[in-house]
From Swiss-Prot:
Gene name tied to this protein: RHO
Cystine pairings recorded for this chain: 110-187
Subcellular location: Membrane; Cell projection, Cilium, Photoreceptor outer segment
Record family assignment: Belongs to the G-protein coupled receptor 1 family. Opsin subfamily.
Residues modified as Phosphothreonine: 336, 340, 342
Taxon lineage: Eukaryota, Metazoa, Chordata, Craniata, Vertebrata
Name of the protein in question: Rhodopsin
Source species: Cricetulus griseus (Chinese hamster)
């Protein structure tokens, strides 16, 4: 084995020389240089500085403007809540522990940090699935005369929390476990060991299939059908500039959604899957730490892609920030055209 396993940790460093120490008790500067831990802390600080204001502003602006409280925006707000979970439950902890060079909060703190970070990430992921299904049902119309209403939105939000808890809670009750990962300053699901005492192998397989592969398939299917439907509508109404514009906007949104989803989550999932399927292989702490950067950065991409590109929300945000004045001067008509509750071929 090229790593060192303890009762509640796995350090990706051989203890042949006797230098490995518990990541809950001692600085891990034998894994990486102190300046690298400082860089990790600086990155976490950047995510907090950017992630908290934009997600908090999303919630605040929606509360201030009644016209934003549409059914679909419930899901978008759920994304903001999920991102705030990641900011407060994960980023702040990692910032503090990185400054000390090890996970100073002990196994209990590791469980809490791992739970909240996983919960926030999974709420965001399943919110994207609900958004994809909503766009598919509204635009592609597999069910005629369907209108996405408040009850559907509430059910969608509840569904995201149920699925997120189904992923984040089991390690707290004996199915798998949370341990420090990468540079040992943040915690996540144990991909490093089989750990039969907690049936770790079955949980990791369950997590990859149910909480990554299936959501990815659903998202690709829904947006693939959406693009096809928009192209077909444009082909039948080639003289319609509005339809052609809608096609371009929806296509751009779809490309951004898929690309940033993959950027945020695929590297982390791919590395975790490699580590799990190559037990005992030689890899360094940076190997797992770098992909996690992309996953954590989703707290910034989500509000930018799913909310900031909406004209109505952007106008309301500017009005709130500028004390009732819209400095861009966009009129209400243009804002209304981009309402997320629309049932015609238009981007969310």
């Amino acid at each position: 084995m090229n790593g060192t396993e303890g009762p509640n940790f796995y350090v990706p460093f051989s203890n042949a020389t006797g230098v490995v120490r518990s990541p809950f008790e001692y600085p891990q500067y034998y894994l990486a240089e102190p300046w690298q831990f400082s860089m990790l802390a600086a990155y976490m600080f950047l995510l907090i500085v950017l992630g908290f204001p934009i997600n908090f502003l999303t919630l605040y602006v929606t509360v201030q403007h009644k016209k934003l409280r549409t059914p679909l925006n419930y899901i978008l707000l759920n994304l903001a809540v999920a991102d705030l979970f990641m900011v407060f439950g994960g980023f702040t902890t990692t910032l503090y522990t990185s400054l000390h060079g090890y996970f100073v909060f002990g196994p209990t703190g590791c469980n809490l940090e791992g739970f909240f970070a996983t919960l926030g990430g999974e709420i965001a992921l399943w919110s994207l699935v609900v958004l994809a299904i909503e766009r598919y049902v509204v635009i592609c119309k597999p069910m005629s005369n369907f209108r996405f209403g408040e009850n559907h939105a509430i059910m969608g939000v509840v569904f995201t929390w149920i699925m997120a808890l189904a992923c984040a809670a089991p390690p707290l009750v004996g199915w798998s476990r949370y341990i420090p990962e990468g540079m040992q300053c943040s915690c996540g699901v144990d991909y490093y060991t089989l750990k039969p005492e907690v049936n770790n192998e079955s949980f990791v397989i369950y997590m990859f299939v149910v909480h990554f592969t299936i959501p990815l398939i659903v998202i690709f299917f829904c947006y693939g059908q959406l693009v096809f439907t928009v192209k077909e509508a444009a082909a039948q109404q080639q003289e319609s500039a509005t339809t052609q514009k809608a096609e371009k906007e929806v296509t751009r949104m779809v490309i951004l959604m898929v690309v940033f989803f993959l950027i945020c989550w695929f590297p982390y999932a791919g590395v975790a899957f490699y580590i799990f399927t190559h037990q005992g292989s030689n890899f360094g702490p940076i190997f797992m730490t770098l992909p996690a950067f992309f996953a954590k950065s989703s707290s910034i991409y989500n509000p930018v892609i799913y909310i900031m590109m909406n004209k109505q929300f952007r106008n309301c945000m500017l009005t709130t920030l500028c004390c009732g004045k819209n400095i861009l001067g966009d009129d209400e008509a243009s804002a209304t055209a981009s309402k997320t509750e629309t049932s015609q071929v238009a981007p969310a």
